[in-house]
């Protein structure tokens, strides 16, 4: 399966903002973007004339990298969002937020989406009482994500209560760190997505 091989901190510098790809490290003095907030490479500091297409492309790349999704799947999500009722850009972000690996991350069971994806692939969680290992699975209203007793000693999961208390979780989710369980109590809304993204630029890019 294809995957990103570029250093994660270089991705943040390339996109010009923190993508929070390395979990807690992004909140410390070790964050590469805080130390060098400019594009990587010899000409990273140089001022460049940016075209409309380049702005749209960067917005798409930034969003893909935040969720760790490759182009083919991301475009598939856009097609699906465009076929739904409502605003296409908002539909796209809601689809991305409803991915199981993102929900695991949002609930505080992982320090990053990449880590959440690995945990899901290893079958660490159950969805409505059944073992799942598909990171892209779309959660639904009322779904319950839980860590079985035998998996609760995994270090990152043992810290779940602390992470949930420190980071919290979105209003559309309910996390119970003591029970190693989370519930989807509503569908995500645009206001629940806090990272800086202009989804309309993505729509304009794909509509050309």
UniProtKB/Swiss-Prot annotation:
Q: Which SMART domains match?
A: Ribosomal_S4 (SM01390), S4 (SM00363)
Q: Which GO molecular function terms does the record list?
A: rRNA binding; structural constituent of ribosome
S4 RNA-binding domain boundaries:
98-161
InterPro entries per record: Ribosomal_uS4, Ribosomal_uS4_bac-type, Ribosomal_uS4_CS, Ribosomal_uS4_N, S4_RNA-bd, S4_RNA-bd_sf
Q: Name one GO cellular component term.
A: small ribosomal subunit
| Superkingdom of this protein's organism | Bacteria
What SUPFAM superfamilies does the database record attribute to this sequence? Alpha-L RNA-binding motif (SSF55174)
Q: Which GO terms describe its biological process?
A: ribosomal small subunit biogenesis; translation
Listed A to Z, the keywords are: Ribonucleoprotein, Ribosomal protein, RNA-binding, rRNA-binding
Q: Which Gene3D superfamilies match?
A: Ribosomal Protein S4 Delta 41, Chain A, domain 1, RNA-binding S4 domain
Disulphide bonds annotated for this chain are none
Which NCBIfam families does UniProt cross-reference here? Answer: PRK05327.1, rpsD_bact
Which family is it part of? Belongs to the universal ribosomal protein uS4 family.
Report quaternary structure and partners.
Part of the 30S ribosomal subunit. Contacts protein S5. The interaction surface between S4 and S5 is involved in control of translational fidelity.
Role of this protein: One of the primary rRNA binding proteins, it binds directly to 16S rRNA where it nucleates assembly of the body of the 30S subunit. With S5 and S12 plays an important role in translational accuracy.
Task: Kindly provide the name given to this protein in its UniProt entry.
Answer: Small ribosomal subunit protein uS4
**Quick one: which gene encodes this?**
rpsD
